Structure formats: structure tokens, C-alpha cells
Amino acid sequence: MTSQFVPHRPHPALRGLVTGALGYRQEGLPPGTHRGLPSPALTLVVTLDGSLDVAAHPDRAQAPGRYDALLGGLHTTPALIRHPGRQTGLQLALSPLGARRLLGVPAGELAALDVDLADVLGGTELVDRVREAASWPARFAAAEDVLRRVAGHGTPPAEVAEAWRLTLAGGGRLRVAEIARRVGWSERHLTARFRAETGLGPKEAARVVRFDRARRALAARPRPDLAALAAAAGYADQAHLTREWRAFTGLSPLRWLAAEFGFVQDGGDRDAAGSAA
């Protein structure tokens, strides 16, 4: 098996709109299913070796589909993506607060949906240019050039933007009541406006932010200590972490780690009291 992951710092002109970028190439894998997990960003994927075969979308009512380029909204359940043993493509993380400028619609209109990128951008220029480029730097530059040109001037309400900032900065730990107090809105009004703009309610967003941070921390540890991870991420206990992990991935933390990376060196750690991975 060969794997290549190429991180890229987004162009300064896209600051606040594109929060991350990655090129990836994996070959020699056994055919299987990749889980597209919830995160605090919309996901833009351009494939370079065929199409993306989505067997199940976050909204299970959406029919399976194949995409040359896909845009996924914020969600709380995993997408299931079949692959034939190889995966090559470019992935961008888009801030939900930048959706109006980049896509012409609020991220709330894309909640739990996967859509063909061409349907949102109004054409295939981004996909065509990325696929024509011969190197990772050229591919990133091509995608960013198109996004810089299509970016408009729409912005979310300042109160929603501040609520999102507080959710990220607090790692999902701030209560909705406290966020509402800080932005000067009632909880009910904040929840409605926040969901319309991002696709998630404030409580859901906090859960996703907390999970995303825990996922990154777990992926970086060859010998995971789930109890310590739960405490650091703001979960009540290890059992709480495991429940949330199952809700977002369909697997326990250690089973997810084994499925994603092929091995787990857990030194006897268990997913939750009385429950092996």
C-alpha cells in the first residue's frame, strides 16, 4: 500500500472562506468503504482517478450517487463512500460562514446533503482545471483561482458569525445559553438563525466541534488513552465519548481507528467500561 497526503495552506485571499486543503493519493488498499465524518466545515472533493461512489449520504433519504466533484454540507452522521482500492483527489474545507460568498447560498441550504459541485458553481471549470494540472501546487492554485473569482460579497449576520466563533474557540464547551447571552439574542432566536445559516443548531455544532477535535487527537496517538482523551475534549467521561463516537461514525473509537488506519496499539485500553473495542 502506498499513501501520499499533501497539506496546503489556503491562499490569503480566501482566509475565512477556505479553512484547509489536502491532496491525497492511496493505492494498493483492499476495496472497501471510507467514512466521511462530521466536521465543522463543508467538504469540497475533486477526484483525480474516477468518480466518488457515495453508497450512503448523511441524509439517508438521498439516493446513492457518483460524483466527479462533490460538495457536502454540515452533517451529524457519516457518509459511506465505496472505493476500489485506490483514492486520489483534492479536498478543501470550506467555512460555513463563507458559503454565501463562495457558493451564493447559506450553508444551511446544504445541510446533510451531498451535491454535484458543478450544480453549485454553475459549471465544471474548477474540476477541469484541477484535473488538467500536473502537480499538487498547480492543482491547489487552479482550485483557488476559480474560488477567488466566484467569491461574492454575502455575509452572515454578525451575531451568527460571533456564535460560530465562540463555538470553535471554546471547543464546543460553551453552553447555548451563554453564547446567546454574549451575542444578545434569545436561545430560540439564536438556534433558528444559526441553523438557517450553517445547517446545524448550536448544540449540534458544539457536538461536532468537540468530536472533530477528539478525532484529530485520537488519530495522532499510536497508544490512545480514551479516558484522558475524553477529559481533554470536554466529555463527561469515557462512556460519553464512546456514545458520541458511535453516533458520528457508526463505530466505537478503537474500531474506527483500526478501520481508518489498519492497526491500534491500545495497550489494553477499552472503549468504555466493560466494552472492548
Give names to the regions the model predicted.
Residues F194, A206, E244-R246, L257:
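DNA major-groove recognition helix of helix-turn-helix
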Residues M1-E187, E197-P202, R216-R221, D225-A236, ...:
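Alpha-helical bundle regulatory/interaction domains
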